[in-house]
Amino acid sequence: MAALCLTVNAGDPPLDALLAVEHVKGDVSVSVEEGKENLLRVSEDVVFTDINSILRYLARVATTSGLYGTNLMEHTEIDHWLEFSATKLSSCAALTSALTELNHCLSLRTYLVGNSLTLADLCVWATLKGNAAWQEQLEQNKTLVHVKRWFGFLEAQQAFRSVGTKWDVSENKARVVPDKKQDVGKFVELPGAEMGKVTVRFPPEASGYLHIGHAKAALLNQHYQVNFKGKLIMRFDDTNPEKEKEDFEKVILEDVAMLHIKPDQFTYTSDHFETIMKYAEKLIQEGKAYVDDTPAEQMKAEREQRAESKHRQNSVEKNLQMWEEMKKGSPFGQSCCLRAKIDMSSNNGCMRDPTLYRCKIQPHPRTGNKYNVYPTYDFACPIVDSIEGVTHALRTTEYHDRDEQFYWIIEALGIRKPYIWEYSRLNLNNTVLSKRKLTWFVNEGLVDGWDDPRFPTVRGVLRRGMTVEGLKQFIAAQGSSRSVVNMEWDKIWAFNKKVIDPVAPRYVALLKKEVVPVNVPEAQEEMKEVARHPKNPDVGLKPVWYSPKVFIEGADAETFSEGEMVTFINWGNINITKIHKNADGKITSLDAKLNLENKDYKKTTKITWLAETTHALPIPAICVTYEHLITKPVLGKDEDFKQYVNKDSKHEELMLGDPCLKDLKKGDIIQLQRRGFFICDQPYEPVSPYSCKEAPCILIYIPDGHTKEMPTSGSKEKTKAEPLKKETSSAPKEGPVPAVSPCAASEESSVLYNRVAAQGDVVRELKAKKAAKEDVDAAVKQLLALKAEYKQKTGQEYKPGNPPSAAAQSASTKSLPSAGEDRSLYDKIAAQGEVVRKLKAEKAPKAKVTEAVECLLSLKAEYKEKTGKEYVPGQPPASQKSQPSPASKAEPAGPETTEAKALFDRVACQGEVVRKLKAEKASKDQVDPAVQELLQLKAQYKSLTGIEYKPVSATGSEDKDKKKKEKENKSEKQNKPQKQNDGPGKDSSKSQGGGLSSSGAGEGQGPKKQTRLGLEAKKEENLAEWYSQVITKSEMIEYYDVSGCYILRPWSYSIWESIKDFFDTEIKKLGVENCYFPIFVSQAALEKEKSHIEDFAPEVAWVTRSGKTELAEPIAIRPTSETVMYPAYAKWVQSHRDLPIRLNQWCNVVRWEFKHPQPFLRTREFLWQEGHSAFATFEEAADEVMQILELYARVYEELLAIPVVRGRKTEKEKFAGGDYTTTVEAFISASGRAIQGATSHHLGQNFSKMCEIVFEDPKTPGEKQFAFQCSWGLTTRTIGVMIMVHGDNMGLVLPPRVACVQVVVIPCGITNALSEEDREALMAKCNEYRKRLLGVNIRVRVDLRDNYSPGWKFNHWELKGVPVRLEVGPRDMKSCQFVAVRRDTGEKLTIAEKEAESKLQEILEDIQLNLFTRASEDLKTHMVVSNTLEDFQKVLDSGKIAQIPFCGEIDCEDWIKKTTARDQDVEPGAPSMGAKSLCIPFTPLCELQPGAMCVCGKNPAKFYTLFGRSY
């Protein structure tokens, strides 16, 4: 049976029908949607509008539910109660008697009819639920006892509770229609719109399937239809018989129905052909149109040259004569067209005599051969809109130039004028929307059809799992915004996830090819019911089977180790007791033991699984994943899309699915745990008697908008990747060092080595820029080819930092080939493991992953064959150093005999046991025996081999680490020899990444935490990644789980406090006072000043609920406070004596931007100060604007050491609702982009007129005068600018005046040889320095941590940007001196102890000045004058900003921005952009010459204006 659709009026929902749906949903598929009326749609032809009819129909189609009783008598009783609830119980006058009757009938009954729930109960309960009088009695406990019992009994049931909560219709609770909830942040109303009188239209051309761009248009029109309780006309634009096809009309109607859009009227443009023709003849007779036979190409050229046609001045009679030829369709008539006579000299090309009618002799699908002339869309549209009563015509901004033509036609014909409302077209990356291009994909067989999930058609995206509700929420979030931007599909899918995540049931599926059995002997074969959704009990329960044998993912099994405790989801903790592998090292099965009493799931691996049981066999399933059809995000205008077609965009995986998958229906959306969301494209079919085969369940992956990798099977392996990388990178240094002949490496090898290194840089750069996959793959392929060539020529693997040596080897080297070969093979396995992990992490195609895994397994098998041991990560084969002298060969360098090797392995294994026990924080009773056994094994090893046991990873690194340690202590010049087991050994273990101490495993050291302290990206190479690392590693920012919101850590907040202290002090000197206004703004207040809030409209965040209760009216979270503060000003100002009012507040604001968030620079919540003043005169306000602007400049220049350009914003860029805006602009040379530092606005009287801030002017008694206002603001963006300008490749560089810590004191030279007395004296000296510096107001911190070396501390505080590092050691104390290291230059200064205070103060001031000077020089070299557009474009592309002659016109500025836009990103991850105006500098670089023209070449220049790319 086809799915039913219940439409519900949210203002008056039929609770009884909704309850019926809840009770029959197990038998019948019924979808519920919101609309303007209550009805049940059974098919296109059958619709029920009467509630009782709906109830009876639902009950009769779901016979097993028993809602309509079990016999004729019960049917009759139910009919009685249906009538009773609709009449007596709904009447105020008869309510008392009706309740008495109901109470009597329920005195001995649980249900009204029979012994089970029926329609009678649903209907009567729903009526009482919506009855205010009954609800009042219930609250006052005045209800009749049996009715109350019965009502409460039903209300407690899940279905009643669910419906009653979601569709609360109690009159004492105001509801908000859910459509309004979708309008989050979009309150732009239609001009002139009146409730109930709005008519909108959706006019598609019947020439193809609707795509997502059409869906936006349709849903926007529906939004205004519903919001204004108006009318939506669905009109087919069939003005072109060549394109119009009847088949597509049916297709489009189906697409509209899929979107749950219900038009009030269906029309065709062809319905009005006669009327349109009469209007055309009217224009001819009035001399406003003429017939032209100019060939098309010539006409196009004339329009471009603004040349009039030879027929433009024809007489009316001549035009009518030619018009008749057109109507006949004669050969001459076919060469003609009817043109409007408007203005051939217009700057708007659409006004240069556009075509109104053309001659086409093809038959029309609806009118046949009746007409030979057909109107153009541009002529027919305004006429039909007027005739059909359209009040508001919604059109995309690409039609903007045609709006003038639209209104000309309306005025020329003297007909009613609709209002055009513009919105932005939906542009999506990696997508083509052209019907011609989409048809090519279908014809080429690259897709399955027009409903292919890769297609942007309505049916395509719905088939891929997009929900109509998700699409509506996305469209509503965009609203009627006019900003034209290219959006990622991720945005849409993220909205969709919000809809499906709370309701999608959770199931399990395992990759069939890689499942591994797990034997759990003590498990019982049984079934339990668990929640389908862990957070939503309404989704219901599902059966989960348990058995002694279960299956898990092979990728998960690879991550396990024996003895590990693993959490099996929906079962509990299980211990892995044994891992069985085949000869190739592949895991074949696992043995496990239940540990269900252990409920600690915090540190365990969580995996999915399926039981082997005959009661519930796994269901075969195919998971299909789709990629973009187009590989390039944005295609250029002239680019051929066929060059960027992704020929491998569909991938399938065969899965073993949850037995519950057999019940899925087509279109059901589920989540496969740890894999993602899927939609059922084809339900499972059991074995067919015809084919003797079962049909698998086909599931299509639904993207969910995430950009970070999801946790998947084997995800634990990713956590191992990092240590493995370190092992492989350090491994070459531990292997045998071949003896090198005196001659240098050959020139050819060196050249090849350099080519490999250069190509490696190319690959890294492409990945950093997130280049197209095919570009990266090509570069990687070339890199691998070069590496293979290098190995062939040199006989060695390419290793970064290890250039080729000569091939000559001594005889002693050749005598030991096996150790080197083993090590080389070990390194190959490690590298191939990295390849496999990377492919899995990137979700590469299955074929690629399989090929890489097979290669890995063959390498492991080869390694085992050669060494006789399994490959173990972190345990490379023992190696011997190749020495030229025979004497050196005799020295033992590791285990040599079979017995020694076996003992070596036992020590290593026992070391692992000890480390694991300590990592798991096992009890001392367990750890001590393990350590004792380890020590005994080490003693045995020493007695057998004569040498101490040393882990392989520590070999050969002592010399290097000794140098490293000496370097760390160089301020003390500590060059004493150190014992083997002292510092160097310990550092060695860190550097190798193995977590082992130099003395072996388990000797009191335990596993050491590995940290990647320094920056791994360079500012000049990958600015975005560098910035991200700086703010996190320097402890400025902590990321938060709400996108666009960040935690300001003390290190960054202290900078804001410094700015706040300075600025607060200065504004108070001016007479400004601090205050605080609420964060919440009413909708009415926010909408008062349209021009002001228009820019903020898309960014406003709304509060719509309190708990689960919808608010009567949504409340905005302030994007700015003008509309909050100024009504209060109006109350406080009564006369001129109440002025001026000068208030400031330090607070947070929320602007829910859709752009890519960037900490400090573009965030959804940020801190700021906002000042708002009101004055009696214009001049007073103007003075304050400049005073505040100068304070902002001082914040940047005196505190942050950043030079700024002071100036005034252009008309386009000024503050919405203000008279003019002044600004300070900073420049970031690393990106070649400017950034707005702070603004100070003169608001004139705009807001005072809106909010009635008036006073009586003493000069003109009796007259009211509006106040003059200004506002000004500075945000935490300042911190981001400071980081970008001063930071370097070592981290932050903090200007001393805002640094949280200006000097950090670090003790050096603490070694084992240092006595306790000297150590304490050194600590005391450090604290003494701290006390002395605090005494002269220097912010200082002493780092006395004993678990970090001095070198580590140096790096740490350099990364955090501390201006000065003070190093002091025992020798410094004896010499009464210390070493000061400057962060800005790295310069080291030796300073006498007695001069500490004075010298450090001087250094700090010098650092502040140096930073400012350096940044000023940077700005000076990057800000130039350009007098032509060509020169300006070159300047922009070289990463500079320029002052150009400019006319100040908004259209001109838009043109400059469009002209200077470029295809390539300004920086990785940043959107492409054109230049925008930054400010009109108060002090330009040069004076404007008289007669100078704007760079556009059209208008005289008014001033030099600073333009550039900007954040």
Curated annotation (Swiss-Prot):
CDD domains: GlnRS_core, GST_C_GluProRS_N, ProRS_anticodon_zinc, ProRS_core_arch_euk, WEPRS_RNA. Residues 807-816 have a biased composition (Polar residues). PROSITE patterns: AA_TRNA_LIGASE_I, AA_TRNA_LIGASE_II, WHEP_TRS_1, WHEP_TRS_2. The keyword GTP-binding does not apply. InterPro entries: aa-tRNA-synt_IIb, aa-tRNA-synth_I_CS, aa-tRNA-synth_II, aa-tRNA-synth_II/BPL/LPL, Anticodon-bd, Anticodon-bd_dom_sf, Arc1-like_N, Glu-tRNA-synth_arc/euk. This is Bifunctional glutamate/proline--tRNA ligase. It is found in: Cytoplasm, Cytosol; Membrane. GO terms for biological process: cellular response to insulin stimulus; cellular response to type II interferon; glutamyl-tRNA aminoacylation; negative regulation of translation; prolyl-tRNA aminoacylation; regulation of long-chain fatty acid import into cell. A motif ('KMSKS' region) lies at residues 432-436. The lineage of its organism: Eukaryota, Metazoa, Chordata, Craniata, Vertebrata. Residues 748-804, 821-877, 899-955 form the WHEP-TRS domain. Its EC number is 6.1.1.17, 6.1.1.15. Gene3D superfamilies: 1.20.1050.130, Anticodon-binding domain, Bira Bifunctional Protein, Domain 2, C-terminal domain of ProRS, HUPs, Ribosomal Protein L25, Chain P, S15/NS1, RNA-binding. Residues 759-955 are annotated as: 3 X 57 AA approximate repeats. The modification Phosphothreonine is found at residues 355, 897. Multifunctional protein which primarily functions within the aminoacyl-tRNA synthetase multienzyme complex, also known as multisynthetase complex. Within the complex it catalyzes the attachment of both L-glutamate and L-proline to their cognate tRNAs in a two-step reaction where the amino acid is first activated by ATP to form a covalent intermediate with AMP. Subsequently, the activated amino acid is transferred to the acceptor end of the cognate tRNA to form L-glutamyl-tRNA(Glu) and L-prolyl-tRNA(Pro). Residues 296-315, 708-741, 794-823, 868-903, 952-1015 are annotated as: Disordered. It is a peripheral membrane protein. Phosphorylated at Ser-998 by RPS6KB1; triggers EPRS1 release from the aminoacyl-tRNA synthetase multienzyme complex. In monocytes, the IFN-gamma-induced phosphorylation at Ser-998 releases EPRS1 from the aminoacyl-tRNA synthetase multienzyme complex, allowing its association with the GAIT complex. Phosphorylation at Ser-998 is specifically required for the RPL13A-mediated interaction of the GAIT complex with eIF4G. Phosphorylation at Ser-998 by RPS6KB1, is also induced by insulin through activation of the mTORC1 signaling pathway and promotes the interaction of EPRS1 with SLC27A1. The modification N6-malonyllysine is found at residue 300. Mg(2+) binds at residue 1236.
